[in-house]
């Protein structure tokens, strides 16, 4: 897991070096023990997507979020009206994730607590791409793209990396 996490941090950092206006910190560390403890402490009866750490890395921000999603609550498909990309890294569990397509019966769900930008949900996604997701998989979902879990075979635990070129996420 550490190699994958380090690779994701490097990839996100290298892609925006030219856009930096201030020097980045020497490093931001999150150990596997810290990540496991954080996700273990999330409620088991709700969909939890909470920030473990958000860092200003020199001209933009990067958030690392821990997610627990119980099997019986896959949740509706959603869309975040933002330029913040979401990079999922699956830790445990399996399910089917759909991305793209059209959000059917789209409705506002208010502003995101992470970015302050509008969020939307729907009853389903038509014409999207579905894939089975297992531990170790990485899925990159650009901002403003419909996405959602259509089914969960088990409870799932994953990390979301959110590179934020606009600096919308509060540092934590």
Language model features by range: what are they?
Residues 82-97, 101, 109-123:
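Short, conserved beta-strand element in jelly-roll/cupin
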Residues 131-152:
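Conserved metal-binding segment of the jelly-roll/cupin
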Residues 84, 127-128, 135:
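Short, solvent-exposed loop/turn positions at domain surfaces
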Residues 153-170:
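A short hydrophobic beta-strand segment most commonly corresponding to one strand
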Residues 18-83, 171:
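A short, N-terminal "cap"/entry segment at the start of jelly-roll beta-barrel domains
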Residues 4-16:
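Bacterial N-terminal signal peptides
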Residues 103-105, 156:
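Short, surface-exposed beta-strand-loop junctions and turns on beta-sheet-rich folds
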């Amino acid at each position: 897991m550490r190699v994958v996490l380090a690779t994701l941090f490097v990839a996100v950092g290298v892609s925006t070096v030219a856009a930096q206006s201030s020097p980045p910190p020497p490093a931001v560390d999150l150990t596997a023990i810290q990540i496991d403890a954080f996700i273990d402490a999330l409620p088991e009866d709700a969909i939890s997507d909470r920030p473990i750490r958000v860092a200003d890395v020199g001209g933009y921000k990067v958030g690392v979020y821990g997610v627990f999603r119980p099997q019986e609550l896959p949740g509706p498909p959603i869309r975040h009206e933002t330029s913040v990309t979401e990079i999922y890294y699956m830790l445990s569990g399996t399910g089917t994730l759909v991305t793209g397509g059209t959000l059917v019966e789209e409705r506002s769900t208010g502003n995101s607590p992470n970015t302050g930008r509008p969020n939307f949900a729907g009853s389903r996604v038509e014409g999207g791409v579905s894939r089975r997701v297992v531990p170790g998989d990485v899925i990159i979902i650009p901002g403003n793209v419909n996405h959602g879990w259509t089914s969960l075979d088990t409870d799932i635990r994953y990390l979301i990396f959110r590179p934020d070129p606009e600096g919308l996420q509060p540092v934590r």
